[in-house]
Amino acid sequence: GNLSVAYFTGYDEEENLLKIKEAAKENSWGLLIEDPTEEDNVPTKLKNNKFVSLIYPLTDFLGTVPGYFEYDISGWFLGFILIFFGIIFGDGVYGLLLTAAAAALIIKNKKAKKEIPPAFLLLGLFGLSTILWGTVTCTWGGLPAEKLPQFLQSISIPVISNVYADKIWYPFWTNGEAGLTTAQ
């Protein structure tokens, strides 16, 4: 008579192999399990902690998910994007607005008993990094540093702060003999 053979190929996670083997045994299937090779176009599933996973909406949007045999830089990418975002926006008031928007979106979802999308939490982190950079540079709403409260001026970092833009700053390695303004 006629004999027909059907087969399919695919990829699955290693932790599912036992289930697949059991199903094959129960159904009398032939089963061949191989590790992928460099030539295979293997889908990538990233596994990171909850904090690092917050970067996934951005990496998915940018299409920067690493290949199966590539190193996952999600943690490094999150760290550097937070630093660069804070530097680029660089104003504490913008950071407060971003953080407030993220908080409003999170609260709205919690009240509706919906899951909080990672993008909302990432927006909050972007806001916090912008607040931090605005604080260390004493940049708040474009106001001159001397118009800001003294406590904001005092917690800024002299070499990058607007408080010291027109003042001479003496780096510790010059023993007070050479000074710079932050404009130099």
PLM region spans:
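Conserved, carboxylate-rich catalytic/transport cores that coordinate ions
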Residues: 18-184
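Coiled-coil termination/hinge junctions
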Residues: 1-12, 16, 20
